Amino acid sequence: MGLHTVIAIILAALVVPLTQARLEAQERRMTQEQIIRDLIDQVPPLTHPRDGALPIRGSRLEGWLPEGDEEAKQILRALDARGLALCAGINPGNEAALAQALRMGRLQQELGLEVGVHASRAMYSFFNGDESTAHLADDGTPFFDDSFGSRKMGCPFRLDGRKDEIKAQFRSFLAPYKDAGITIDFLYLDWEIDGPIEWNDAWEHSKRCTVCRAHIPFIDNFLGFQRALRAVRSELQRECCVQVVQEYFPDALIGNYSVYPHGGIRYWYDYYEKLPADAPFIADQLARYRPWEHEFVPSGYTFANPVVYTWYDTWSWYPAWANDDYRWFYNLLLVGTNAGRHTPQQVPLITWVHWHTTAPPADAPPVPQMSERAYQELLWHLFLRGTDGLMMWCTAEETTKEVSLMVEVLDGVLGHREFLGAEPVLFDVPTEPGSVVSALRSDDRLLVRRTDFGDNPGPVTRVVAGRVVTIPRLDGECQVIDLTTCPPAGR
């Protein structure tokens, strides 16, 4: 037997089990129907009805209903009883998908439920690989930035020619909804790796581009570069999505993943983002927080959509703390507080969340999972710092667990209905593991939550509206405190 034959036999022996494992994994992958039915089977209904509060939506809550209308309505009712809502998935050019979307919208409307749409595919792609969207070198040669994976990212200032096609993709489903008498109440995008983005190698590519240099006189200043790109990105979203949707449905809630009011800093990185060399940052232990341009108002969106995920790198940023949960909680609360503190109360704040450790690199060493208790406490604090509703991204197999944790907290929040829409008044994020306190104020009453990451059994105090509020330790519970019983500060 020759050497080549031996090698071939060995390779075949290795490939067979790998192929079999891959097939078995595919067979185990849950379908949308299995996901929805499992949620109904495993997640208990709310004990406090929504009655107008925002439902939970997410990446796995869309796209499927049974064929019969009556059974489909039963599914929609069962999900609503659990605080969950489906969105129709839009796929421009796919008539079958459009028919399914219209049917879902009709049934939701007949039941008095909000009609939701996930329209990300209508927003793709500005950078479609055509040379008309490329950067231009000094000699006129087109070139692309390949630091964002498979998408060919080009020149931010050569995208006007793409606007009409993107607008047409939105009109291709908006007009049929309108013609069918179905009102879209909620529309969201997850529009990420497309259009102008300043991270990865974008800055260096733009410095080489004659068009970029002409549009950004101070291109060597990263903040000037960032401002110019985010202005174009906001314009694309406003003109091609928001304004077009509002022509048909002026009262729709419209938002995009990761676009929200903030204080000028972003405390997290998406899975594809890297800080360019020489770009400014704020250090916090090993974390590098980034300056971020204000894009929510220029984009025109009508709900804020921050992202509070357990990104894999987050835990490793804070080695000074032995408390694993606080290494997660601290960063996630910074993100949620940043949005809650700066989003006007009249603007719905709908927060993306995810509990399972998010986007670990292949072959990366494991990190401690955030505990269920700490995650649910985080959700409580998000609500008490201004979040009005939740969305979730997760894998199919994670869905039931993720939703269960969220629904349990939502039910608890609904048990304090009189505080829904109340004013958040406490935004401190402790820089050491200790007592975290958040509160909503309704007239002279406070709904308070205290969560401890230390051994302090005694009360803590906070000042609200000029009064000293004493908060005893009460693990896992909220407290309602009458401000009029609290002494004035300064005495």
Positions of predicted regions on the chain:
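Bacterial N-terminal signal peptides
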Residues: 6-17
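Short, low-complexity, intrinsically disordered N-terminal segments
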Residues: 17-18, 210
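Boundary at the C-terminal end of the N-terminal hydrophobic targeting segment
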Residues: 21-25
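Glycan-processing catalytic domains of CAZymes
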Residues: 26-491
